[in-house]
Amino acid sequence: MGYTNAGKSTLLNKLTNAGVLSEDKLFATLDPTTRVLKLPNTDKVLLTDTVGFIRKLPHNLIEAFKSTLEEAKYADIIIHVVDSVHPDMDRQIAAVYETLDELQVGDKPVITLFNKTDLAGNAETIKDMRAKCSMRVSAKTGEGIDEFLDELGKILRENRIHINRCFKYQDAGRIQLIRCLLYTS
């Protein structure tokens, strides 16, 4: 998740070879896109690219955008992508957290990725006080991606819950759906 043009689609493409449209324009992403990401420890996770946040959205669009952001309710971790060279970065971060709170997912673990380090140079490391972890990355060049994947795997392992579930025979299709999502790429 993150503000518009922060690099969310570029990150999804870098991590999963998703091939989603990644352009520097408003509303390049209009629908959530989910892909399988294989972590270094061989775990597989589902990664979803969402529509970008924007302040002062016209009221007739607010509900439509919130419906696409509902994906966050099903997430184990929120990956917050921030444009680290945007002059209004602090307000953008605040807008994202306001929306997460409105969606009632503000209590989920957050990894904040300060993206576009290839453009930021040697700027000091920034910290997101609400995030479980903050790091600098470049979705374009791959800088910091390995460290991010290690941290993501670590946080997922810390929060892993094992569930044994019995399904009725007529609901067996759900098991196949879950397997397809997790084991195909």
Model-based region annotation:
Residues 19, 52-61, 85-88:
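Flexible beta-alpha connector loops of hexameric P-loop NTPases
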Residues 49, 115, 138:
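Active-site glycine-centered loops adjacent to acidic/histidine catalytic or metal-binding residues
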Residues 69-78, 82-133:
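Conserved C-terminal guanine-recognition region of P-loop GTPase G domains, centered on the G4
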Residues 118-162:
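Canonical P-loop GTPase G-domain recognition
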Residues 166-171:
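Short, surface-exposed ligand-recognition loops at beta-strand->loop->(often short) alpha-helix junctions
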Residues 183-184:
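Conserved small/polar residues in nucleotide/adenosyl-binding loops
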